[in-house]
Amino acid sequence: VSTSKGIMTDNDARVKNVGGEIICRVFWFIMSKLGKKPIQIPKDTKVKVEGGKLILTGPKGSKELSINDKIFTASISDDNSLILKLIKKNETSKVMWGTTRSVINNAVIGVTVGFEKILEINGVGYRASLKGNVLSLQLGFSHNTLYEIPQEIKLTVEKSTIIKINGIDKTLVGKVATEIKMLKPVEPYKGKGIKERGQYVLRKEGKKK
């Protein structure tokens, strides 16, 4: 094991409660490097900085983010980039720097072009339809399975077997896609169920009689 005290056996490192410092330092370096990287704001999108608050407005909608103004400062540069700077530098704030920068960047992408997940339904008689803000699914059960669509999500159904999930919040789009997939996960033998487009499904051969 590589440690700040040299190379040790795994057992010695456990006894002396050391190890992993090199990996941690590399991680802090990567997150710091990410945090320093400016976020380019597209011409159709506006970002307003108000203390510890960021207000983002773009073609797809608006979003408000809060940042810890005791740790970070945010500003807009002359070339229309958002710069996130650290006030206090320590191991924890360096990790938060990269994470916060990623959250802001995703918000910029979200209000500018949005995020999308596409689900595919496979199975004889399996289909989907929309009834207001409710997704109705026929998935081989004796009753329809209903899923209430969050207000922030735009959901469309194409050809009864394609579900498109759109929104400005990357996390919420992913959450909705996962919840719908879990209503009928793809089984490995015939591939029946709901899967994300491009998702690899490990197929199994059925038992031979």
Annotate each language-model stretch with its function.
Residues V1-K209:
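Ribosome-associated RNA-binding proteins
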